[in-house]
Amino acid sequence: MSSRYLFTSESVTEGHPDKICDQISDTIIDAILAQDPQSRVAAEVVVNTGLVLITGEITTKAQVNYIELARKKIADIGYVHAENGFSADSCSVLVALDEQSADIAQGVDKAQETRELLSEEELDAVGAGDQGLMFGFACNETPELMPLPISLAHRVCRQLTAVRKTGQLPYLRPDGKSQVTITYEDGRPVGIDTILISTQHTAKIGEITELSDIQAKIKEDLWKYVVEPIFKDAEIKPNSQTRFLVNPTGKFVIGGPQGDCGLTGRKIIIDTYGGYSRHGGGAFSGKDPTKVDRSAAYACRYIAKNIVAADLAEKCEVQISYAIGVAKPVSMMIETFGTSKVDEDKLLEVVKENFELRPAGIIQNFNLRNLPGERGGRFYQDVAAYGHLGRTDLDLPWEQTDKVELLKQAFSPQLLATAS
């Protein structure tokens, strides 16, 4: 790759059709696990003009009003205007749910699993809920150890939502997207090439009715109230060469489920690293913690983040894979892209010895079953928009760096030699 290149990542707001589905799916997860932490949940949601369909496989003792949950989440997002073609009060909500397949359950369910703390033998007895491969990544481009492009794209969308919900820009509507292109030199971010924002808006703004004037007003406001606050204290800022694009089609009045059908699990790159790292293909939202697509991807992020936080590497990508019904990973790989300061073979061995990667162990260490109940019925839905990883606004167990000292001690002679 050239020493100078551009890299782009995108994000979407919580009002994007696919993200509505992710949030409803994870709201269902929260509600069920808060009542019955041993539940098995695979909740899929589809939204279209005036319609919500909740489907999937759920095995639980919890009593949940799925229709009420969906309507409340839709209202919280901001779909309360009937003229948008989709609103919490007027949309139809259909529910079509089955129980989890007995063939799948037999490889995962064990009597010991209902206890809080499991022995080594019991951890080995609880298999993965499916086969699959998962990735986790961290790099030192941002304080939260995430790639800069996706970090900024999420910040733009979160600020876009904030100015809408506070009424600062009352003409904005819930649907929106961002895209940020970063200039890199020798593998390090050095500039902001392009900032793109597409945001749904009302047909007129106050007395402004001309389309060109409306778009000019939106562009001016978004720079002042969205872009400038984000970059106020940033080390890398937009400059006179930075392109700022807003609603490039010239109009974005029809949006949300009226404009596009939405489906759970279609924003997996936005949920993770913005394309900067590889992805195993499995979505997160709507899945209980026994699904390794979700829990093991969180564990991979935890490993990668601790390695970078310990300054053992500038970049780190972790891959693990599982077989259905088998507790221990089939394979594990650590890639540091030539930035490792320690022996990579030893690094892999140290990680295997000190990080729990059996599904029941991940669930136990991160407390993934009990967090919805402990946090008032709200945990997974909060990561269903604006990224599951690198969230500085949330207390997430997989974002902790509590293994840093252990890793440093394991490599202290090598690190001292490298420093000298």
Curated annotation (Swiss-Prot):
Any idea which positions bind Mg(2+)? D18
Picking any one GO biological process from the record gives: one-carbon metabolic process
Reactions mediated catalytically? L-methionine + ATP + H2O = S-adenosyl-L-methionine + phosphate + diphosphate
Identify the EC number(s): 2.5.1.6
Q: Which GO terms describe its molecular function?
A: ATP binding; magnesium ion binding; methionine adenosyltransferase activity
What family does the entry list? Belongs to the AdoMet synthase family.
Q: Please identify the protein, giving its name as recorded.
A: S-adenosylmethionine synthase
- Species of origin reads Trichodesmium erythraeum (strain IMS101)
